Amino acid sequence: MPKVRQFHATLTALALSGLVLSACGPEKPLAVAPSKPPEIALAPRIIDQAGAYRNFIDRASSISPTFSDGEAVSKAVEAGSAIESGQIMQGVIAYGAIVALEDSAFVAGVRAQAVGEAQRAQLAESLAANPYNVLAIRGSGEAASRVALVLSEDGQQLYDAGKAVKQSAYDVQKQAWSKVEVANRTGRLANAKSLSAIFFDSSLSEADLRAHAAGRRPAGGPVEAPYSQSVVRSVAVAAMAVLGQAGSLRNENISAVMQDPNIASCARMTKLNTNQCLAVSKPYYEDIFCLGQHIMMDSGRCVIKASGQKEPYEPRFIPTVRPNKPAAPAAPARKPAAKKK
C-alpha cells in the first residue's frame, strides 16, 4: 500500500508541475479580427503623374512624319517638349500601378495577405522599406508581367513614331523650305527648355485612367522574373493602394517607392541630348531630326528600359577603315649619261 500511495503522490506532483509550466508558457497569439477591406485609393499626385505620362505618350506618338512647312515643325517640337522629363519617368510607375490594379487576382492576393488594420499598415511599411517584398504576394508575378508588357508597348509605339519622324528629316530635304534656317533659334531653344521644366497638369481622372488600363491587351508574354525596378515599384504602389495606404496622407512613403534612379538618369540624358541638338540645329530638317531622335525615340527607349524588355536595336554608321595601299617601290635611279668627248 505504501508503494501505491507513493505512486499516486508522484502522479499528482507531475500533474501540478505541468499546470505550473503551462501557466508560465507564452500566450497563443490572438487571431486578427478581419475587417472590411478599404477602398482602393491613390493620392491625387499619383493620378496627375499617371495622366501626364498617358497624355505625353499619346500626344508624342501621334506626331506625324509629314511636314509641309517650318511652322508645322516648330509646333511638333513644342508639343514633344511640353513635359518635365522626371515627371515622365515617375508617370511610368504611376501608370504602371494603375495597370496592376486591373489584375483582380493580384488585388485579391493583397487583401488575403493582410486582413486587419494593423496587418495592412505593417505590410505597407514593409513595401515602403523594400518594394521587392511585393513579389511575395500571391498574384504579383502576373500583375508585374502585365505592367511590363503594357509599358513596353507604350515605349515601342513612341519609338516607332520617332523613327518615322527621323526618317522624314532626310526625305524632306528635297523641299526648299526645309533648308531655311529656323526662325528665332535662340528663342526656340529657350522655349523648349522652359516647357521641359514644367510639370504638366493632366485632365484625366482616375476613372479615365482605370478605364484606359482595363482596355489594354498587350501582345506577348508572360514576362518572367526578374522584373525591372520600375515594374516592381509599380506593383508595390498598387499593393499599397489596395491596402488603403497610398492616399494623400502617405505621400512620403509613396514618393520613396516611386524613385527609379536608372530611369531618372535615362530621362535626364534624353533632355540633355535634346537641348544640345536644338542648340546646334539650324535648318528645319535638323529640328525634325532632333524631334525624331531625341524627343521621341530616346524617350521611347527610356520607357522600354523601364519595362525591363529588350530595347530596340539601332544600327549606327561605323566607317570602314581600309588599309593604306602599299607604296609602289621607287624606280631605280638612272645612271647619268656618259659625257661625250
Language-model features: where?
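Generic ordered-secondary-structure signal
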Residues: 9-13, 270, 280-281, 337-338
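Acidic/polar low-complexity scaffolding segments in large eukaryotic proteins
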Residues: 8, 12, 25-248, 322-334
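Alpha-helical transmembrane segments
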Residues: 15-18
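Secreted, short cysteine-rich peptides and small extracellular cysteine-rich domains stabilized by multiple disulfide
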Residues: 250-314
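N-terminal secretory signal peptides that target proteins for export/translocation
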Residues: 1-6
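Short, low-complexity, Pro/Ser/Thr/Gly-rich segments in the mature regions of secreted, periplasmic
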Residues: 301-341
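Hydrophobic alpha-helical segments, principally membrane-spanning helices and signal/leader peptides
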Residues: 7-8, 258
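C-terminal motif of bacterial Sec signal peptides marking the signal peptidase cleavage site
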Residues: 20-23
